[in-house]
Amino acid sequence: MAQIFHRSTNTLSRLSIFGALFLVVGLLWLIATINRSSYVTEQNVTRAQPLPFSHDHHVGGLGIDCRYCHTSVEVSPFAGIPATAVCMNCHSQIWSTSEVLKPVRDSLKSDTPIRWTRVHNLADFAYFDHSIHVRKGVGCSTCHGPVDQMPLMWQAASLQMEWCLGCHR
């Protein structure tokens, strides 16, 4: 019987199959890499805020405990963003006329909360209870990183499931 295809066709077919396999594996690797990158997880990305609140100054410099501002962290699933009145506990006496704190004073006067940009944002299907973790002795820096060294807040961990499993295994 006569040969229909040239002998090099077998080589070409093998190269095509291995090339397609290499391309599929490469695309899967690329997708997995992008999914874990700071572009998706927003890890180590500083978020713009309505005013420059420095955890470095308040926690690191002045030694204010996280629970002074985030009062519900031990009893509620959510740590919460402090009310403007908490800021004014100190700033009605200290830096009370500072131009930087004008939005805080205006917020208190108008009884309108400051619209902070959320830094740590879990996926909608994930449930995280701050109070359980705090009562079990998990420190704030375990998840939030070195907050006492952050002039502006950023997300120190990826907060993806594989990161959580690092402790929960």
Language model features: what each stretch is:
Residues 1-52, 56-60, 64, 73-82:
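N-terminal export/targeting leaders of redox proteins
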Residues 2-6, 31, 94-126:
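Primarily the internal scaffold of c-type cytochrome electron-transfer domains
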Residues 7, 14, 36, 47, ...:
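Arginine residue identity/basic-tract feature
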Residues 47-102, 129-169:
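Sequence context surrounding c-type heme c attachment/ligation sites in exported
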